[in-house]
């Protein structure tokens, strides 16, 4: 038994900050940002717009797209690094907003790899027969973790949410396989310099960009090659490759190593920057809304995040 995605939705806050606008208060410019990242703009949530609020907007769109009753949902997983509060979880607040009494809900924290981790967890839970319909969300207010004087990091991130509804598959569609990995020894490559038990603050993002670029390409490449090999697939079988939308240079280098044709690679980072765990479901929602995905298409997800955490998922639409 496996599960399949029956609906998806994305949400980006209305406030948009272009590279030119960013250059008014950060020592940078549009050409510098575009050349190094491929990003042209990012969306920024308002001061009173929290992760749970943007998660709700994406969840409502996914529920509508799946054409199900909200009461069919029997589990909620929210993948986030930027919860409203240290506790309770974003997922439990979302459960309340949706009016789902007693439905188990929890947050999953694997940073930018969170959605891929969530896919594996959701698939395992549905495959066990314990749950039938899972709401899986990636939602982030990454701008709350930015040092706006650090041009190496503040240009990279944005706020947003993406969501999917997963149900048991009774045919050959759905999650074919997935893999997830971690390497805690590499945590200093990307982290925040704060935390509740460390200093009582959320901290700001610290990143070793060159090391992260190299490891991102290396780890995702290895994960994908292993996943394809274990399931007797080749790159030529892939109809759409949806990688984590962190940086277009990472995406292009990974696609080059895999020898994936450019028209199969989904790139949305230009319009919303790195939304961490929300980036893959946002990209999926964008391409689904375009009408390009057909039943039977083979889709590949891959992501890497702080931790380090990384992994990939293969599915048949």
Curated annotation (Swiss-Prot):
This protein's UniProt keywords: Acyltransferase, Cytoplasm, Fatty acid biosynthesis, Fatty acid metabolism, Lipid biosynthesis, Lipid metabolism, Multifunctional enzyme, Transferase
Q: What class of enzyme is it?
A: transferase
Give a yes or no for keyword Acyltransferase in this entry.
yes
Q: Which reaction does it catalyse?
A: malonyl-[ACP] + acetyl-CoA + H(+) = 3-oxobutanoyl-[ACP] + CO2 + CoA
Among the GO molecular function terms of this UniProt record, one is: 3-oxoacyl-[acyl-carrier-protein] synthase activity
Q: Which InterPro entries match?
A: ACP_syn_III_C, ACP_syn_III_N, FabH, Thiolase-like
GO biological process annotation, one example = fatty acid biosynthetic process
Q: What is its main location?
A: cytoplasm
Pathway(s) the chain acts in: Lipid metabolism; fatty acid biosynthesis
A single GO cellular-component term from the record reads: cytoplasm
Q: Where is the active site?
A: 112, 244, 274
Q: How does it assemble?
A: Homodimer.
The text the record gives for the protein's domains is:
The last Arg residue of the ACP-binding site is essential for the weak association between ACP/AcpP and FabH.
Function comment: Catalyzes the condensation reaction of fatty acid synthesis by the addition to an acyl acceptor of two carbons from malonyl-ACP. Catalyzes the first condensation reaction which initiates fatty acid synthesis and may therefore play a role in governing the total rate of fatty acid production. Possesses both acetoacetyl-ACP synthase and acetyl transacylase activities. Its substrate specificity determines the biosynthesis of branched-chain and/or straight-chain of fatty acids.
Protein name as catalogued: Beta-ketoacyl-[acyl-carrier-protein] synthase III
Q: Which organism is it from?
A: Rickettsia bellii (strain OSU 85-389)
Q: What is the lineage of its organism?
A: Bacteria, Pseudomonadati, Pseudomonadota, Alphaproteobacteria, Rickettsiales
């Amino acid at each position: 038994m496996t599960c399949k995605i029956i609906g998806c939705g994305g949400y980006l806050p209305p406030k948009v900050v272009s590279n030119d606008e960013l250059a008014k208060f950060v020592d940078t410019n549009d050409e510098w940002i575009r050349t190094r990242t491929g990003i042209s703009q990012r969306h920024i949530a308002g001061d009173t717009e929290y992760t749970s609020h943007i998660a709700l907007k994406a969840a409502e769109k996914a529920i509508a797209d799946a054409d199900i009753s909200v009461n069919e949902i029997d589990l909620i997983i929210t993948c986030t690094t930027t919860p409203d509060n240290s506790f309770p979880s974003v997922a439990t607040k979302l459960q309340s907003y949706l009016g789902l009494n007693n439905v188990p809900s929890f947050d999953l924290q694997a940073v930018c790899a969170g959605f891929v981790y969530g896919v594996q967890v959701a698939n395992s839970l549905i495959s066990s027969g314990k749950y039938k319909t899972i709401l899986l969300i990636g939602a982030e207010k990454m701008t709350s973790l930015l040092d706006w004087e650090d041009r190496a990091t503040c240009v990279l991130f944005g706020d947003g949410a993406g969501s999917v509804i997963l149900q048991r598959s009774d045919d050959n569609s759905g999650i074919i396989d997935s893999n997830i990995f971690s390497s805690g020894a590499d945590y200093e490559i990307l982290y925040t310099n704060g935390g509740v038990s460390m200093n009582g603050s959320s901290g700001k993002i610290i990143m070793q960009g060159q090391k992260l670029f190299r490891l991102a390409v290396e780890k995702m490449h290895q994960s994908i090659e292993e996943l394809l090999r274990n399931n007797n697939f080749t790159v030529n079988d892939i109809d759409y490759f949806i990688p984590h939308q962190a940086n277009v240079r990472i995406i292009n280098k990974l696609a080059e190593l895999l020898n994936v044709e450019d028209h199969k690679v989904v790139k949305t980072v230009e319009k919303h920057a790195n939304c961490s765990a929300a980036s893959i479901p946002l990209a999926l929602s964008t391409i689904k809304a375009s009408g390009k995905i057909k039943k039977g298409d083979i889709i590949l997800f891959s992501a890497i995040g702080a931790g380090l955490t990384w992994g990939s998922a293969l599915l048949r639409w």
